[in-house]
């Protein structure tokens, strides 16, 4: 290789190097490549959090719906129980309810000594509260010779995307304590009446 040719190559490289800081043609592509991972992470994380918030809202709505429907009755029959569970499923739509959605409600009576016990309980995809089991009620609800309807909801939520941001499956829960609206104590009719001692 001749010395003249090497000199021309060095000159061409030097020109390219001096022109490079003034050339703006690839700046947008480089900036986009740097920002893209952050934007994708932000999008997936935001989507996962939004889905979890929406699912939690549905869990709260189901607990309030179930508690309110039970509290508006005086005797819960098997047909009414099934209708309440159907209402819970309808409120929970469009999320899949079986077997991830667990619903439970119970009539809790407080005796003269202030001890709260479960008189009857029903559950969907869950175990019902044990009859005559003692439970702790929140302050203000443990009034002697009264009853309370206790509605509980639990949902195992796994976001369709973004599980890395939520840590996988989250258990969303809510519960509602509500006094009967029409009678002092709501009974459960399973062929024989339960509750209201």
Task: Label every model-predicted segment.
Residues 2-3, 64, 68-197:
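Short, conserved structural patches
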Residues 2-91:
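Alpha-helical assembly-interface signal, strongest on the long, hydrophobic N-terminal helix that forms
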């Amino acid at each position: 290789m001749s010395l003249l040719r090497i000199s021309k190559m060095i000159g061409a490289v030097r020109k390219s190097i001096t022109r490079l800081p003034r050339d703006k043609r690839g700046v947008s592509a480089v900036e986009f490549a740097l920002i893209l991972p952050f934007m994708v992470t932000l999008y997936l994380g935001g989507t996962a959090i939004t889905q979890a918030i929406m699912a939690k809202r549905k869990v709260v709505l189901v607990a309030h719906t179930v508690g309110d429907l039970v509290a508006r009755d005086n005797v819960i029959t098997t047909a009414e129980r099934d209708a309440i569970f159907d209402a819970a499923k309808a409120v929970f739509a469009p999320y899949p309810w079986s077997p991830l959605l667990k619903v439970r409600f119970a009539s809790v009576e407080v005796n003269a000594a202030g001890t709260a016990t479960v008189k009857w309980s029903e559950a969907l995809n869950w175990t019902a509260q044990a009859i005559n089991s003692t439970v702790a009620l929140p302050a203000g609800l443990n009034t002697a010779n009264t009853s309370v309807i206790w509605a509980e909801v639990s949902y195992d939520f796994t976001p369709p995307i973004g599980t890395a941001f939520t840590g996988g499956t989250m258990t969303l829960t809510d519960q509602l304590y509500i006094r009967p609206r029409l009678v002092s104590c709501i009974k459960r009719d399973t062929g024989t009446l339960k509750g209201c001692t």
